[in-house]
Structures are given as structure tokens and as C-alpha cells.
């Protein structure tokens, strides 16, 4: 049984529940959550997939996201982590079904492709209008667990909210209703703009003893890079080669799972690779703005790169993956898809740094610099709750 103190205000406004469960979801939803609290009777549920403070709690504080009790954090915290993936996913389904049954929101919003998004199944079975942000993203790589989650949530959602025309076209080609598929753009520009002053004022370089353009920033945490023995060895051998070639600090913002994998494997990192606790949003972005290059498998890297390009502060963005669900940013020249071998990583990093230094730059991806996304999301939810109830569930109005 899920314990919670939350109660709806019952002030006549539309009741919207937002479900999330990881750091990237908090980041991407930050502006949307604030907008929903402004215009809806809103409840934020956090399915606690990340138990580390630096991967969850600190981000509510970074974005000043307070719950209905005036505290930093969600309205309802739901523990879901079990002894294996099956138990965790079962907990997400069971506990979300319990919450949605009891609270009966008018609409349920999820973003992305994490396991917490599978709570959408509960909303669907309970006939609660379901809205999905980041719909239609595909990298066409079945090795990624997120790819399965994307397909499930896209297909069952009542209204799909896409970042780009690539994503919208993909959903249309698979037969999903065009009349309930909208392109909003990515929420990241709005989030970055909202926190830009805090980012610029961060003293993280001083705290870590770093200087502008004299370090490389690293983030590597994706399942396909960490859990696969072959990929893990290939990637971190390449990272060591990068440290040797550039002979400077590589600051690794390291997730607990990645750190445990390094310890368990016994892999010896080059001494110039500094393993650091996961960094908060403002500190991490300050480091991105001042790094010689950013080497990352994060899905937000293309969007962050596009935003910084739009404000006249380009970054050398190198994506350590073999596929991407953001082809629109690749077309705009906002990042380099590097792969994970030593040759690929060294060549891509050399190119990214040289192009930045010479001013050979891409252009901001239009889908990634829209700062009105939260407004659009709120308006679409308000407009479509009744439409879905009438057209999909045939409920009496």
C-alpha cells in the first residue's frame, strides 16, 4: 500500500497527475511542472528509481520545485526498486494503479522512456486521459531498453507530444492518430533559460580546481555502455587513450551504478580521469560551458549543445553512442556521434574541438530552442482531457 498525505485542492481546476522516476525526467519536466502547478490542481508522483541524493533530491532543489506542502520534492514518493528489473517494473505498475485508482486525476502526464513511464499502462486501463511527452523518439537500436518502453507508451497514449517532425512523422507512419499527435519541441531550452543565471554563477570550477578549456567533461551511464562487457572495455579503454592524448583532467560525473561497475571490473582508469560524484544541474552545465570538450552518452547533450549555440556559446559535444533518437540535431550539426572505440572517440573529439576553435559550427535546431513548450503542453492537456473522455472512452460529459 502506498502511503501519502496528498489531497486535491478541489478548486474546480483540471486535476493533472505527473508521473516521473529519474533525474532526466525531473530536469525535462521542471518548467512543465511549474506551469502545471500554476494552472492545474496538480500532483507530482515520483517513482523512486534513483535512490542516490545526487540523482534525485538535489534536482528538486536546483529547480526550486516545491510540493503542495511547501517542501522541495514531489507530492507523493513511491518506492519501487526491487531485487531485479521484473520486481521493479511490477512495483511501478501495481503502485501506480493503486494511486491512480484512489486519486482519479482528470489527466496523467509522463515524459520519455524510463521504466517509470510504464505507469502509463495503469492510466490506460483506468480510462484516464494519457499524455506522453517526448513521443516518437526512436534510435532503431533494440539493445536499448528505452526503445521498448518508447513503443509501449507511444501506442497506448491518448495524446502524443513530439519534440520534432522526425518523431511526428514516425508516429504517423506507424498508424497512430494524427489528430492526437502534436509537435511541441523539446522542453530543455526553457529549463536551461530558467536556470541560466544560476548556471553562470556556479563556483564549481573553483571548488574542483579546474580552469576553462583545461579539462574534458565525461558522463557515461547508459546500460548499453556499462552493462555490456565488450562495450564497457571498449569505451573506457578509449577514455584512457583520450586522457593520454590530451594530457589533462577528464572529470567523470559518475553514477553509482557506473562506479560499482568500475570497482567490480577492476578496470584501471588513467590517473587523469577524476571520478566525481554525480553533479547537480547548475554545476554540470557550468562545467559544460567551460570544458574543452564534452564526452557523454546523455540524451540531453544534443539539446544542450543546440541551446548553447543559440546563445552564442558553442560547446564541443561528442556523443559516445552508436545510435541516436535525435536525428534533427545531427542534421543541424549540433553534435558528433562518436561511437565507443578508441579510434572513433579520438577522431570525433579532435574534430569537435578543432571546429569549435575555428568557428566551424552547426546551427541551433529549431525544435530545441523553443522556450514556450510548457505553455503549449498545458494548453493541449486542458483542451484534450474532455476530447479524450468523449471520443476515446465515450464518457458522459
Task: Specify the residue positions occupied by each region the protein language model found.
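Nucleotide-activated sugar donor-binding and catalytic core shared by glycosyltransferases
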Residues: 1-248, 258-397
Amino acid at each position: 500500500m502506498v502511503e501519502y498525505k496528498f489531497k486535491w485542492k478541489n478548486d474546480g481546476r483540471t486535476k493533472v497527475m505527473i508521473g516521473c522516476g529519474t533525474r532526466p525526467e525531473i530536469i525535462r519536466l521542471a518548467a512543465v511542472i511549474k506551469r502545471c502547478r500554476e494552472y492545474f490542481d496538480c500532483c507530482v508522483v515520483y517513482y523512486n528509481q534513483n535512490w542516490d541524493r545526487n540523482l534525485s533530491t538535489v534536482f528538486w532543489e536546483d529547480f526550486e520545485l516545491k510540493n503542495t506542502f511547501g517542501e522541495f520534492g514531489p507530492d507523493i514518493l513511491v518506492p519501487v526498486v526491487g531485487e531485479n528489473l521484473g520486481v521493479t517494473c511490477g512495483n511501478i505498475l501495481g503502485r501506480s494503479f493503486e494511486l491512480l485508482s484512489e486519486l482519479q486525476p482528470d489527466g496523467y502526464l509522463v515524459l520519455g522512456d524510463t521504466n517509470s513511464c510504464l505507469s502509463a499502462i495503469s492510466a490506460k486501463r483506468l480510462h484516464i486521459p494519457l499524455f506522453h511527452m517526448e513521443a516518437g523518439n526512436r534510435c532503431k537500436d533494440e539493445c536499448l531498453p528505452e526503445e521498448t518502453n518508447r513503443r509501449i507508451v507511444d501506442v497506448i497514449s491518448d495524446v502524443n507530444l513530439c519534440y520534432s517532425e522526425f518523431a511526428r512523422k514516425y508516429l504517423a507512419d506507424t498508424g497512430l492518430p494524427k489528430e492526437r499527435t502534436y509537435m511541441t519541441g523539446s522542453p530543455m531550452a526553457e529549463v536551461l533559460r530558467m536556470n541560466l543565471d544560476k548556471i553562470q554563477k556556479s563556483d564549481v570550477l573553483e571548488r574542483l580546481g579546474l580552469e576553462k578549456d583545461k579539462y574534458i567533461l565525461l558522463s557515461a551511464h547508459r546500460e548499453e555502455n556499462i552493462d555490456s562487457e565488450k562495450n564497457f572495455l571498449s569505451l573506457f579503454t578509449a577514455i584512457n587513450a583520450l586522457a593520454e592524448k590530451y594530457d589533462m583532467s577528464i572529470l567523470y560525473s559518475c553514477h553509482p551504478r557506473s562506479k560499482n561497475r568500475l570497482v567490480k571490473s577492476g578496470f584501471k582508469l588513467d590517473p587523469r580521469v577524476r571520478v566525481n560524484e554525480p553533479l547537480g544541474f547548475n554545476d554540470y552545465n557550468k562545467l559544460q560551458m567551460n570544458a574543452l570538450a564534452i564526452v557523454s552518452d546523455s540524451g540531453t547533450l544534443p539539446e544542450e549543445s543546440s541551446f548553447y549555440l543559440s546563445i552564442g556559446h558553442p560547446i564541443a559535444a561528442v556523443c559516445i553512442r552508436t545510435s541516436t533518437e535525435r536525428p534533427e540535431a545531427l542534421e543541424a550539426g549540433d553534435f558528433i556521434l562518436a561511437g565507443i572505440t578508441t579510434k572513433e572517440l579520438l577522431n570525433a573529439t579532435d574534430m569537435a574541438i578543432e571546429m569549435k576553435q575555428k568557428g566551424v559550427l552547426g546551427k541551433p535546431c529549431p525544435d530545441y530552442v523553443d522556450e514556450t513548450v510548457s505553455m503549449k503542453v498545458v494548453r493541449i492537456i486542458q483542451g484534450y482531457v474532455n476530447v479524450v473522455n468523449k471520443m476515446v472512452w465515450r464518457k458522459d460529459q
